[in-house]
Structures are given as C-alpha cells and as structure tokens.
Curated annotation (Swiss-Prot):
A UniProt-annotated Pfam family: UPF0176_N
Descriptive protein name: tRNA uridine(34) hydroxylase
Superkingdom assignment: Bacteria
Domain Rhodanese: start-end pairs: 136-230
Family matches, as SMART domains: RHOD (SM00450)
Enzyme class per UniProt: oxidoreductase
Protein source organism: Rhizobium meliloti (strain 1021) (Ensifer meliloti)
Family the UniProt entry places it in: Belongs to the TrhO family.
Gene name tied to this protein: trhO
Record PROSITE patterns: RHODANESE_3 (PS50206)
NCBIfam families per UniProt: PRK00142.1-4
Amino acid sequence: MTDMLTTSRRPETPGQFLVAALYHFVSFPRFADFREPLQAICDANGVKGTLLLAHEGINGTIAGTEEGIAAVLACVRAQPEFAGLIHKESRASAMPFLRMKVRLKKEIVTMGVENIDPKKVVGTYVEPKDWNALISDPETLVIDTRNDYETAIGLFQGAVDPKTKTFREFPEWVRNNSGLHNKPKIAMYCTGGIRCEKATAFMKEQGFEEVYHLKGGILKYLEEIPPEESLWEGACFVFDERVSVTHGLQEGEHTLCHACRQPLTPEDLQSPLHEEGVSCIHCHDTRTEEDRERYRQRQRQIMLAKKRGARHLGS
C-alpha cells in the first residue's frame, strides 16, 4: 500500500464537475460507524456518487464542485486509517451521478476468496512511465482484470482478456489456465488500480512470484502518457454517465444501453437493432416483447422528465 498523500490536480473549467476516484486497502474495523457522517458530509456539499466501506478499507467514485470534493476528501483523510489516501481526478461536462450512496460491504471490491489481503501481500507497483517497457518485454504476460463489457471497448496491446462477467470469476479463470505459468512475469491492470491490486495478492497466493500491477490503473496511464507514446488501444470504460474516457481523461464517444448496460459506439447507434432505452445490438435477441414494452414505458418517462428539465432516476 502507498503511504503518501498525493493527488492529480487538473485545471478547473467553468461549468464542469470534478470527478474523484479513490480506494485504500487498510484495516478499518469501525467502518460501519463512519457511514452516516460520510453520507452527511457528501449530502451537505452536493457531492454524488458511490462510496463503499468495509473492514478492508474504502473504494468509490464521487463527483461535485471543487470545494465539495475537497470537503469530502478532507473528511475521509481525517480518519487516521485514510491519512495516506490517494485519489485520481478527471472532469465531466455534466453531473455523472444521480444520487449519493455510502454502502457497507464485506469487501470493497468483491473477489469472494477468503484470506486474500493486499495489506499484507501484493504485487509490485509499476508507474505509468515504466509500464510500456514492462508489457513490451517478451517475458511478460499482460492480463486485464476487468469484465468483458469493459474490455470490449479498450485494451493494452497484447493483453490477455479473461472475458469474465464479474471479478468473482477471475480466481476460477486463473486456476483453469495452467499456461499462465509459462512466462516468468505477470503484469496486471484495471481501471483505477483496485481490482488488479487485489488480483496480484491472489496471484501471489497461487504461487506466481514475479507479479506487477499498473499504479493508478488505466486512468492514471491515460492522464500521464501522451497518445503518441501510448500502448493503450480504444477507450476506458468508467462506471458513471460519461461511460468512457480517452487520453487526457477526456470524455469518450460511447453511450450506454439502458436495457443491458453495455457500452455503445456511435456506429452501434445506427444499427436497426438499436432502440434508445429499449434494446441494442448486444441485447436485442435476448429481450421479450414484454421486456421491450416495459423499457419503452420507462424511456417515455425519461423523455418527459428531460422536457421538464429534470432527471429520471431510471435513466
């Protein structure tokens, strides 16, 4: 774990919202007691998003004004356990979340494997500036620890895609692929760093010795590495209404199918199988007519809310 307080500051643009992604693995036995005061400080400052609290730490993404985010982060870092919290910042042209939720969980990122503790055993952090050299090494096997709907829109060159539906499937995928031991180095990455950090702890437990992970995840890489030097291909899926970001953490061109939650390209929107809010190329064949009619009713409510200048919670 890191033991320094740091932040990536980006110049504020009028009318934009600041988005802060954060996580910290640390023993936090009083996590349940922190939920209400954390929810209160978020609500008081107009901050929205989701924060997860568990015995193993904190994880989440929030958005708001510069001042609002600063107030929430100050509250979190005022807890001795989170004094060394690192967060990553990006911008959104509109508020990317509908509400603020502080939730209590068994794990801040769910792997479902007992006794995996990144606070005790973890892989070696690799700074974004050193990542290209590592993954270009023929002795390195690069593994994406994200889910299939995320990897569908972007990957590092040469990365292995486990095509998991959830992070819970990752341990089984590792156990079923003995060929992963064929190369001496394993390099892992994810969106912001939390999944690959926990995954490296699992890999070490499985007997892999030389395990690395991208510090700060794809987001930090896209922030720091210019496009002309980048080995990233595509866009990075994010879990808010921006849907994706690209180099410089600029908002991508993807939208989300509100029926199946799959990211869509502008080309996907032109498909005859696409009906806004109802179906897309990914889910058209899996929906019944009853499903479609229910989604159409929801979409009508969303459009009515937009006309009133409001936002429908189902959007």
